[in-house]
């Protein structure tokens, strides 16, 4: 994936967008990239909590955009992995404080002058000003979707908005997949989701209780675990870096085997 400024979006809240941003940021850093993750969900800040960094927040995104702090003062370095930094959202301001043009300048500054290889932008749910700001500097997008009808419908709307903004390098992350439910016909399959939305999946994240456990502990799963979701997040980070990583059976169950064949076909027989 050539895009260096990537917005992580969904349309619908509660699909695992923030957890995905944290794990992909940490995964890319683990693989050697210098990564900034930015929380644009002003007023509902939680990327700092998911990453276990809430106790170290001094300045936030709005402080930087309004000139009260320099980017370096607001960026929090994650001590558990080299080269991972968080720029937290403001908890007190509302989304009207966001300025898309200034945000675009900030992301450009991080990539061109602060030496970051990649900036991942955690977009707020919805399509209002928060999304418009988060998408302003983006060259690519990761659309996080759960395999359920309402999530897919919202994702379809977001994909249309991304294309209208001429953000072209867009991929799906299908989150919380349960192969047994798919096999019973109680959940949309990967094939269904891909067919409806017309985007290639770059990550398939299985339902995994370790995601909730690590989030509650303020630990990023990809840095500590070898559970199915941790492996899937790291594989996704590798694909973002351009590696050809086959979709594997992540210790799911035999129902997943058919799914893996579908994915390999989608990715041209890898």
Question: Where do the model's predicted regions map?
Answer:
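Conserved catalytic-core segment of NTP-binding enzymes
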Residues: 102-105, 109-113, 118-213
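C-terminal lobe/tail of nucleotide-utilizing enzymes
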Residues: 164-270
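P-loop/Walker-type NTP enzyme "switch/lid" segment
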Residues: 42-117, 213-217, 222
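Phosphate-binding P-loop
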Residues: 1-3
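Conserved beta-strand scaffold positions in the cores of enzyme catalytic domains, especially
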Residues: 5, 86, 201-204
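Flexible glycine-/small-residue-rich
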Residues: 10, 39, 88-91, 123, ...
């Amino acid at each position: 994936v050539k895009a260096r400024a990537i917005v992580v979006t969904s349309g619908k809240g509660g699909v695992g967008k923030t957890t995905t941003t944290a794990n992909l940021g940490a995964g890319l850093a683990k693989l050697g990239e210098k990564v900034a993750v930015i929380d644009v969900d002003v007023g509902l800040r939680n990327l700092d909590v998911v990453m276990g960094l809430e106790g170290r927040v001094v300045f936030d995104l709005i402080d930087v955009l309004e000139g009260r702090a320099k980017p370096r003062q607001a960026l929090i370095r994650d001590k558990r992995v080299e080269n991972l930094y968080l720029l937290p959202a403001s908890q007190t301001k509302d989304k009207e404080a966001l300025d898309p043009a200034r945000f675009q300048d900030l992301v450009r500054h991080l990539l061109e002058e602060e030496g970051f290889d990649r900036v991942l932008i955690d977009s707020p749910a919805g399509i209002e000003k928060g999304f418009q700001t988060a998408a302003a500097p983006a060259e690519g997008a990761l659309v996080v979707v759960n395999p359920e009808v309402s999530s897919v419908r919202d994702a379809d709307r977001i994909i249309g908005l991304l294309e209208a903004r001429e953000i072209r390098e867009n991929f799906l992350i299908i989150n919380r997949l349960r192969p047994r439910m798919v096999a019973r016909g109680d959940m949309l399959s990967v094939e269904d989701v891909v067919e409806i939305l017309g985007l290639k999946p770059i990550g398939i994240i299985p339902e995994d209780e370790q995601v909730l456990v690590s989030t509650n502990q303020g630990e990023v799963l990809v840095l500590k675990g070898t559970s199915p979701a941790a492996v899937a997040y790291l594989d996704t980070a590798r694909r973002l870096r351009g590696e050809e990583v086959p979709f594997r059976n992540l210790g799911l169950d035999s129902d997943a085997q058919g799914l893996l064949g579908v994915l390999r076909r989608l990715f041209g027989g890898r």
